[in-house]
């Protein structure tokens, strides 16, 4: 296997990574490549850091899209249709890396023979791996087609403007040449399909009525029948061949264009993450289906007109009746299909909501489990699912009508036509009757494809609207204006900026400031300093401006808008956040930014990064950015790749960065050092590790401007000091650095300090100048000094020595816990997605049957299907029987002569035959309605039960499952797989069951007329068996590959959306786009082959069907005079019907099995996922008022995160007294977070026990335990919904209690400003609140809960010092009678604790009062305090 060279030898093969198959150019692996659109050279260091994700998923990298473009450019000079026309050449040469379809001749192309070698490979191996699959053709590559679609869309926008622009017209132009050609092929199919029944079958049946035999003439008729069927089959195959390639090109183009747009968005507030995932999974599929099936709609009117004309010629005026039935049914089917599409459209919205909520649940599952909110979220998802199910049921009824109409309409048309024809006194012969019936059968093609076509076009129409709304969203524009002075890096002049928020939101999107300072020290008089010390003159009007919603008339153009990018009227609302910002930052300056929670610090740096809308003033920037977000964004890649972020590996610089960011000790405890794979969102890292990796990425990038948003908040004092001095002050000495922080001691060393308040810069200058100003800054800094003065003197000389050593050892619980247990695969965290092998086991079908209601329900459904098809067959047989009876031996008198009549109109029982014939139609309609209702209810019950059981299993899975499984993979089960089970599987299963029974009836009818027919069926059955065995494996394996390649690109979308700000700042859009194109093309390759494999089978099955109809024709010829013409007509009509039906049925069998792989994947999770302990254990529930005291006892507690991993807690024993306040400190990897994991039983103990008030927590249910504990997490978590639902999901508290909690957390005024107060919307991830505000709401949530035991995990890290002090005071008061465990890195937050617990290497090494520990200068706690305390004491 080739290693991918991304900078020396730093990427090594992972077990999940497969060979790259002799590809000359691999995206993201070769240096110096040219982007045709920009002409820029993209060197090796600009490659996508997500390369390694492919290894985990077992994916390959396709031929470079750039090499594609080069080849296409060369071919473009030969003519636009050169490649298409070259298929007509009798001799062709194969070029390297060419997809077989590109080299296929016309015969091979339309019969899909180019796919046969792959079918042979699969048959021999019994399975299919990605290395067996050809890379996607250069003509189908997503990049090539995206560029074309993008150009067409841009031309449309330029021509008519964004409001009038039609994406439908653009899509039509994109596809039209190939679609027109496919429609021409479809016309040939229709003409051939019509000619056989209309002319050949008619003459053949007339021949059976003739008394004389003419063998030569009759054999020519059979030959004609054979030829028309072959032309029909192959021209239809060519239609599909063209449509499938068109569909794949359109899907690749529109999905790539969508992701390209996502990467350019300012924010995604108008689109939820669930909607974007749905767009990129289901909507892309709908665009493909529209291109593949939509053009078949054109065949309907043609065959209807031809059939009507022909029937009138055969029967006279009554021929209009049957055609009228078809003509009436055609718009009726269109209407029903549109109704189906309407309900599908409503269902899509419900699915979006469900997927979004599922994504939220999966993202914050740890928090949901700890808060015992599993039931609340389960009910929320179930409520959405119930609404989705209700809509699906309505859509299912209409869909069932469309499936069953085709065979019914033939009977209805026949009954109406022949009954009226006979009633009016016209005669009817077998040749006439069965020619008309056969023509009716050929006309059903229009009705068969109508539900597919209309459904696909209607759903695509919805998808197009969603894509268009995405394409018209406002893009982020990096600031291009340069400051006037070369020494100035950032310049803002009188800048007023606003955040964009969703237009549909019930509220504005506030970045509000909690009024934490009211009744506090008022700012003293301010003086104007020479260094432009600023205090805003707008304090009087801030309250009025705050929360002011800007309507469209208030929108003012930004520099970006002046370049043609405008905010469209009514498209969004703007929330003013920053006011009249005047700022100049010189090159090489370290600028500290501070202020209270929600004061606008993050907004200020977002404005500099171009993330906000400029309303007034100007912004100018000179240089490139490196950005460290407040909540670190970590890729699912190796630790090294996260730091390199696509740049070339420079060992010296890399090692220097590791040292500056204190990452060396962490590498020592990771199983594969810096090549250890990091989970999604840094799942196997602590908050501090994530932040340091994010900082290391910035340092390694070597940019000119560094924007650091509170990068030290999650770090302990020693590490924070080291990083500030070594990384920020020393390493970035010559760089321009914007350093946002709440830890004011660091501002002492900044060249300049900016203090923000309510969206304005109120103070600015050096630390000394601001202290002399004696304003807000001096007030909060003095509070810091007062609050942190230790009771004993600390000598800080030891800070750099002894304390560092303890960090080098000991397993880091957050990292060790989620590693792969098997040592041979060290460093690999995310497990390769399982892929089923062999055929779908019967147990999967049994699971589906059981979910649908059990064997009895299945038997009832099957009986209804048989009765339904049987009633259709009976009506046709009754017609032949009626014709055979003729006059019923009635005697006709002509003058003096009498003779036996042959005319049916003379039959004395005419009314009897006609009544039975009409009654059969009524019975058939009733049975169809009953069958439809029962089938829809059964399949929906199955899909709903599978969904509910899957959801239950996922929610009850232990944390190790979520740590080793990408969210995209789990979401794939709930989005694409559930879509298959909800919609596509029932649709195809219904047709399959109906058609397979119909096939047996057809063969039975023909065999009843010609018993010798069964002799010919024998060899054909052998051929069919061989085909079925080969195709079944091929189709099933390709479908499985399609399923597993879907997950990585969905994960990539999710990850990219979460890191949009970072991607923008580092200007890595192109690299992430290339990675997406690779993942999409890897999915498109098996997806395209899967669709082609269906037609490969269909063409070959059609040959068997043609053999059957030819055999029937020969039987009629050779048994001339032995068989009544009525029965001969019956046989030939069923034989003609069998031609398309047989291949369609067998293809449906393979496709239905392929769809069942989604059931298999869902069932795999249901059967294999291990479960946590029960939520409640009967007879073991603790007392209702437990715990009364809050005493916690650990007795020799041992814990490891998975088997075969080292212990992270080693025989830990201690007792925490009731109401005691404990501070827990320790270096990274010491086991602090593991204590919390053990207490909440997120991981079960390996040994020992934990007791709360004497009750062993392992003996009670998880809900009983977790509901009695409260936690305020390190990273604040808000869910989409309302403020109330975030604080009180179970509606347990009164409004007064909620407002009281908000007041005590200083969020009351913030929430009171919102239009809907407690019912105001909280956006996904709480994006309409700052990180500090989110944390305050989390504290309010804990206040409401008021448990006897509270764990604070660095709960106030995202707050300014003053808010921190106020909140600490609130917590002390509110939880005075509670046992409180505080895990902290900022040591001043635990100095007031009753006792301090110091952990090292999973053991308690010190546990005493702060005064005792600080009086011992050799204690670990003393050494840890030295860094922070010394800094404030000396510099302050």
From Swiss-Prot:
Keywords, comma-separated and alphabetical: ATP-binding, Cell membrane, Endosome, Glycoprotein, Golgi apparatus, Membrane, Nucleotide-binding, Phosphoprotein, Repeat, Translocase, Transmembrane, Transmembrane helix, Transport
GO molecular function: ABC-type transporter activity; ABC-type xenobiotic transporter activity; ATP binding; ATP hydrolysis activity; ATPase-coupled transmembrane transporter activity; carbohydrate derivative transmembrane transporter activity; efflux transmembrane transporter activity; glutathione transmembrane transporter activity
Keyword check for Oxidoreductase: no
Transmembrane segments: 179-199, 219-239, 296-316, 317-337, 400-420, 426-446, 608-628, 847-867, 916-936, 996-1016, 1017-1037, 1101-1121, 1126-1146
Domain of life of the source: Eukaryota
Modified residues annotated as Phosphoserine in this record: 14, 19, 43, 60, 505, 509
Compositional bias per record (Basic residues), positions renumbered to this chain: 514-529
Reactions this protein catalyses: ATP + H2O + xenobioticSide 1 = ADP + phosphate + xenobioticSide 2; 3',5'-cyclic GMP(in) + ATP + H2O = 3',5'-cyclic GMP(out) + ADP + phosphate + H(+); 3',5'-cyclic AMP(in) + ATP + H2O = 3',5'-cyclic AMP(out) + ADP + phosphate + H(+); N-acetyl-L-aspartyl-L-glutamate(in) + ATP + H2O = N-acetyl-L-aspartyl-L-glutamate(out) + ADP + phosphate + H(+)
Subcellular localization: Basolateral cell membrane; Golgi apparatus lumen; Endosome membrane; Cytoplasmic granule
Binding site for ATP 1: 595-602
Name this polypeptide is given: ATP-binding cassette sub-family C member 5
UniProt source species: Rattus norvegicus (Rat)
Gene assigned in the entry: Abcc5
């Amino acid at each position: 296997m080739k290693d991918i060279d991304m900078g020396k030898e730093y990427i090594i093969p992972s077990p999940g990574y497969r060979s790259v198959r002799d590809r000359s150019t691999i995206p993201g692996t070769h240096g110096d490549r040219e982007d045709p659109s920009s002409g820029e050279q993209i060197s090796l260091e600009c490659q996508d850091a997500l390369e390694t994700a492919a290894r985990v998923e077992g994916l390959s990298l396709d031929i470079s899209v750039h090499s594609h473009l080069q080849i296409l450019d060369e071919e473009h000079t030969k003519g636009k249709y050169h490649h298409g026309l070259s298929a007509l050449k009798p001799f062709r040469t194969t070029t390297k890396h060419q997809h077989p379809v590109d080299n296929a001749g016309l015969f091979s192309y339309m019969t899909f023979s180019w796919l046969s070698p792959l079918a042979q490979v699969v048959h021999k191996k019994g399975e299919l791996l990605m290395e067996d699959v050809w890379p996607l053709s250069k003509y189908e590559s997503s990049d090539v087609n995206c560029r074309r679609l993008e150009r067409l869309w841009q031309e449309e926008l330029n021509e008519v403007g964004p409001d009038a622009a039609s994406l439908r017209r653009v899509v039509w132009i994109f596809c039209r040449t190939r679609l027109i050609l496919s429609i021409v092929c479809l016309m040939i199919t229709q003409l051939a399909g019509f000619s056989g029944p209309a002319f050949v079958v008619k003459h053949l049946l007339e021949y059976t009525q003739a008394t004389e035999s003419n063998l030569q003439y009759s054999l020519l008729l059979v030959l004609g029948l054979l030829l028309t069927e072959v032309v029909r089959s192959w021209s239809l195959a060519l239609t599909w061949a063209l449509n499938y390639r068109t569909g794949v090109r359109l899907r690749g183009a529109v999905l790539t264009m969508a992701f390209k747009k996502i990467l350019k968005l300012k924010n995604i507030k108008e689109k939820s993450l669930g909607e974007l995932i749905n767009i990129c999974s289901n909507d892309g599929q709908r665009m493909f289906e529209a291109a593949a099936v939509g053009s078949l709609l054109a065949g309907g009117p043609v065959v209807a007109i031809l059939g009507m004309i022909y029937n009138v010629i055969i029967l006279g005026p009554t021929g209009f009746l049957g055609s009228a039935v078809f003509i009436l049914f055609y718009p009726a089917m269109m209407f029903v299909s549109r109704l189906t599409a309407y309900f599908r459209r409503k269902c899509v919205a419900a699915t979006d909501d469900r997927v979004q909520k599922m994504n939220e649940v999966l993202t914050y599952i740890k928090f949901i489990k700890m808060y015992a909110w599993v039931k609340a979220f389960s009910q929320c998802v179930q409520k959405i699912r119930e609404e989705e199910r209700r809509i699906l049921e309505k859509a299912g009824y209409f869909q069932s009508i469309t499936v069953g109409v085709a065979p019914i309409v033939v009977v209805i048309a026949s009954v109406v036509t022949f009954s009226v024809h006979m009633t009016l006194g016209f005669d009817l012969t077998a040749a006439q009757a069965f020619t008309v019936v056969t023509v009716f059968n050929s006309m059903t093609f229009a009705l068969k494809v109508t539900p597919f076509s209309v459904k696909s076009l209607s759903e695509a129409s919805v998808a197009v609207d969603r894509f268009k709304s995405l394409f018209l969203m406002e893009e982020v524009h990096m600031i291009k204006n340069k400051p006037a002075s070369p020494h100035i890096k950032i310049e803002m002049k009188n800048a007023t900026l606003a955040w964009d928020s969703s237009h549909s939101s019930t509220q504005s999107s506030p970045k509000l400031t909690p009024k934490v300072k009211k009744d506090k020290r008022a700012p003293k008089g301010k003086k104007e300093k020479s260094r432009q010390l600023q205090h805003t003159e707008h304090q009087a009007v801030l309250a009025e401006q705050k929360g002011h919603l800007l309507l469209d008339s208030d929108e003012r153009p930004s520099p970006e808008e002046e370049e043609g990018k405008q905010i469209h009227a009514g498209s969004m609302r703007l929330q003013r956040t920053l006011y009249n910002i005047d700022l100049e930052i010189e090159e090489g300056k370290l600028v500290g930014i501070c202020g209270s929670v929600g004061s606008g610090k993050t907004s200020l740096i977002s404005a500099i990064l171009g993330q906000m809308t400029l309303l007034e003033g100007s912004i100018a920037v000179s240089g490139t950015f490196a950005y460290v977000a407040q909540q670190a964004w970590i890729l699912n890649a190796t630790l090294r790749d996260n730091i390199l972020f696509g740049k070339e590996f420079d060992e010296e610089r890399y090692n220097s960065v590791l040292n500056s960011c204190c990452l060396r000790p962490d590498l020592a405890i990771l199983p594969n050092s810096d090549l250890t794979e990091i989970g999604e969102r840094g799942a196997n890292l602590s908050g501090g590790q994530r932040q340091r990796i994010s900082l290391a990425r910035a340092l390694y990038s070597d940019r000119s401007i560094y924007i650091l948003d509170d990068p030290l908040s999650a770090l302990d004092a020693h590490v924070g000091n080291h990083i500030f001095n070594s990384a920020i002050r020393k390493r970035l000495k010559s760089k321009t650095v914007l350093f946002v922080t709440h830890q004011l001691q660091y501002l002492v060393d900044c060249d300049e300090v900016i203090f923000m308040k309510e969206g304005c810069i109120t103070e600015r200058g050096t630390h000394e100048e601001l202290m002399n100003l004696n304003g807000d800054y001096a007030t909060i800094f003095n509070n810091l000094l007062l609050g942190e003065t230790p009771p004993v003197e600390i000598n800080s000389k030891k800070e750099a020595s002894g304390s560092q050593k303890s960090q080098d050892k000991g397993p880091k619980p957050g990292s060790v816990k989620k590693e792969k247990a098997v040592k041979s695969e060290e460093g690999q965290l995310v497990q390769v997605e399982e892929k089923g092998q062999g055929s779908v086991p019967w147990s999967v079908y049994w699971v589906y049957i059981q979910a649908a209601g059990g064997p009895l329900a299945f038997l009832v459904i099957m009986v209804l299907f048989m009765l339904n098809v049987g009633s259709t067959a009976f009506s046709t047989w009754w017609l032949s029987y009626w014709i055979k009876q003729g006059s019923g031996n009635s005697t006709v008198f002509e003058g003096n002569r009498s003779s036996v009549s042959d005319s049916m109109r003379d039959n004395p029982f005419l009314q009897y035959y006609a009544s039975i014939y009409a009654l059969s139609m009524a019975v058939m309609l009733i049975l169809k309605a009953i069958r439809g209702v029962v089938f829809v209810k059964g399949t929906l019950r199955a899909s709903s039960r599978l969904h509910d059981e899957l959801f239950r299993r996922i929610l009850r899975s232990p944390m190790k499952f979520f740590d080793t499984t990408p969210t995209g993979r789990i979401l794939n089960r709930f989005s694409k797989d559930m879509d298959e089970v909800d919609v596509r599987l029932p649709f195809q299963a219904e047709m399959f069951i109906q058609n397979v029974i119909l096939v047996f009836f057809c063969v039975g009818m023909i065999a009843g007329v010609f018993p010798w027919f069964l002799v010919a069926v024998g060899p054909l059955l052998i051929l069919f068996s061989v085909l079925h065995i080969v195709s079944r494996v091929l189709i099933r394996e390709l479908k499985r590959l399609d399923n597993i390649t879907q997950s990585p690109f969905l994960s990539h979308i999710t990850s990219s959306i979460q890191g949009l700000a970072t991607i923008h700042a580092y200007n890595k859009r192109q690299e992430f786009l290339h990675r997406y194109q690779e993942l999409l093309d890897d999915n498109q390759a098996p997806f395209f082959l899967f669709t082609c494999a269906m037609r490969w089978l269909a063409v070959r099955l059609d040959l068997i069907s043609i053999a059957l109809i030819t055999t029937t024709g020969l039987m009629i010829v050779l048994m001339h005079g032995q068989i009544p013409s009525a029965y001969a007509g019956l046989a030939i009509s069923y034989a003609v019907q069998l031609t398309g039906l047989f291949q369609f049925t067998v293809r449906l069998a393979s496709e239905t099995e392929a769809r069942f792989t989604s059931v298999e994947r869902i069932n795999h999770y249901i059967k294999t996922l291990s479960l946590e302990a029960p939520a409640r254990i009967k007879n073991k529930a603790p007392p209702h008022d437990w715990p009364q005291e809050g005493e916690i006892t650990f007795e020799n507690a041992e814990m490891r995160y998975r088997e075969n991993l080292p212990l992270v807690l080693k025989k830990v024993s201690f007792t925490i007294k009731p109401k005691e306040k404990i501070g827990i400190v320790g270096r990274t990897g010491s086991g602090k977070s593991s204590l919390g994991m053990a207490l909440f039983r997120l991981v079960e103990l390996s040994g020992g026990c934990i007791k709360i008030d004497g009750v062993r927590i392992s003996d009670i249910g998880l809900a009983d335990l977790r509901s009695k504990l409260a936690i305020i997490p390190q990273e604040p978590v808000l869910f989409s919904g309302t403020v109330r639902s975030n604080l009180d999901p179970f509606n347990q508290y009164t409004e007064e209690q909620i407002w009281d909690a908000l007041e005590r957390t200083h969020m009351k005024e913030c929430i009171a400003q919102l239009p809907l107060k407690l019912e105001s919307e909280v956006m996904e991830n709480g994006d309409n609140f700052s990180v500090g505000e989110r944390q305050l709401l989390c504290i309010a949530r804990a206040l409401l809960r008021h448990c006897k035991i509270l764990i604070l995990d660095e709960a106030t890290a995202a707050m300014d010092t003053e808010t921190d002090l106020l909140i600490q005071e609130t917590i002390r008061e509110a939880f005075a009678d509670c046992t409180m465990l505080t895990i902290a890195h900022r040591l001043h937050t635990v100095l007031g604790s009753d006792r301090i617990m110091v952990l090292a290497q999973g053991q308690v090494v010190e546990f005493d009062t702060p005064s005792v520990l600080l009086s011992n200068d050799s204690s670990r706690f003393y050494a840890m305090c030295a860094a922070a305390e010394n800094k404030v004491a000396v510099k302050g």
